[in-house]
């Protein structure tokens, strides 16, 4: 006499399917978190933006503009036209499509949370405001830095990269 095992097989299939679905959902959520962290790191610590910021910092020091920025004690936008008065092609050097809304903006702030936080009101871009809140949360403002230069390079209107250079 044969036993009818169809009910047991059906229960086994359901249990195994639930286990497999649970594992796949867990993997998906973990990979989504990793992808978000990578995207944040990629946008907030962009290499091109780093080199541009360091180049402008060196030029501000060389031209003596940095002393003016420090003495005013205000957070403000850096006038890049003064820095690059002899070279108007710095947009093309960084693949900036100005026709599609691309731009380069740089901001100066003393190295404290309030000065950095005040920069959020100077730019209407939502991702810039997110970056400023990221800076306020992730930096230790008790360190002995003097000022920050924060750069926003937007290749197009909605493809923006950032870097915050802390200077002693």
Locate predicted features.
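Low-complexity, S/T/G/P-rich flexible repeat/linker segments used as non-globular hinges
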Residues: 119-168
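Low-complexity, serine/threonine/proline-enriched polar segments
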Residues: 70-123, 135
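Residue-level marker of intrinsically disordered, low-complexity segments enriched
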Residues: 14, 76, 94, 130, ...
């Amino acid at each position: 006499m044969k036993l009818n095992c169809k009910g047991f097989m059906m229960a086994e299939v359901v249990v195994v399917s639930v286990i497999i679905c649970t594992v796949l959902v867990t993997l998906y959520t973990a990979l989504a978190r990793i992808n978000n962290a990578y995207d944040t790191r990629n946008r907030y610590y962009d290499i091109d933006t780093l080199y541009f910021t360091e180049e402008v910092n060196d030029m501000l020091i060389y031209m003596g503009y940095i002393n003016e920025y420090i003495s005013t004690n205000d957070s403000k936008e850096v006038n890049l036209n003064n820095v690059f008065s002899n070279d108007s092609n710095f947009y093309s050097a960084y693949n900036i499509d100005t026709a599609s809304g691309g731009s380069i903006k740089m901001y100066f702030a003393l190295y404290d949370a309030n000065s950095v936080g005040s920069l959020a009101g100077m730019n209407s871009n939502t991702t810039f405001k997110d970056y400023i809140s990221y800076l306020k949360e992730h930096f230790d403002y008790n360190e002995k830095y003097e000022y920050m230069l924060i750069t926003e390079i937007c290749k197009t209107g909605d493809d923006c990269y950032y870097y915050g250079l802390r200077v002693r």
